[in-house]
Amino acid sequence: MNHYPECTCQESLCETVRGFSAHHPDSVIYQTSLMSALLSGVYEGSTTIADLLTHGDFGLGTFNELDGELIAFSSEVYQLRADGSARKARADQKTPFAVMTWFRPQYRKTFDHPVSRQQLHDVIDQQIPSDNLFCALHIDGHFRHAHTRTVPRQTPPYRAMTDVLDDQPVFRFNQRKGTLVGFRTPQHMQGLNVAGYHEHFITDDRQGGGHLLDYQLDSGVLTFGEIHKLMIDLPADSAFLQADLHPDNLDAAIRAVEN
């Protein structure tokens, strides 16, 4: 039987519940390529969706040619497209950048009142205060609003991602049930991944979603856990090998494209 000790969290949001995984093996984050490569326009990879699912049942990323956002949970992968729609991804589709794990949450918190994105993050940060660890988080619930963007499909010659997002479509899903998948990445990993919180959303009918810019949860269940291990597959193609992976404006550029 799992033991669920109580803890106190800021502004009585609390009783974050220690959960599920005292006896589970350590989770590992699997990542294909680098965020800095995506930022510089490396939009084609050789890793398939089928490959990703051998490394985890939960994650996020994008698709070749930057054709929308990727969200994965319960071993199902969806493509969140530039028109705001969503569809199930094919096993043979490929990704230039994705992050996956076997989701083994350690904590659970039920919300029966509205909370902001920042308040949700505060719950996680208080329970796992060290910024030197990865966290994976999942929410199933009713969202008062979910403000998203997606990236439009690109064609060669590829522009840098900061230029692509000048054309990004944005959407607002109001009063919708849905699923959030996200990671909190340490600041020292900026460039390898996206430092801070990176979250994707899909509606419960699996017909729409995107990369989250902001949201408010009316009610739902948050599960999350810390991850201590990271494995990265680096591409060997010429686009990656010739890319500038550490430009002077790396941190500012990533913050601009993600937020």
Curated annotation (Swiss-Prot):
Q: Say which enzyme class the record assigns.
A: lyase
Extract the coiled-coil ranges from the record.
none
What GO biological process terms does the UniProt entry carry, in alphabetical order? acetoin biosynthetic process
Recorded catalytic reaction(s): these are:
(2S)-2-acetolactate + H(+) = (R)-acetoin + CO2
Q: Does the keyword Lyase apply?
A: yes
> What EC number(s) does this enzyme carry?
4.1.1.5
Provide a Gene Ontology MF annotation, just one.
acetolactate decarboxylase activity
UniProt cross-references to NCBIfam families, sorted A to Z = acetolac_decarb (TIGR01252)
Q: What is this protein called?
A: Alpha-acetolactate decarboxylase
- Gene source species: Raoultella terrigena (Klebsiella terrigena)
Report which gene this protein is encoded by. Answer: budA
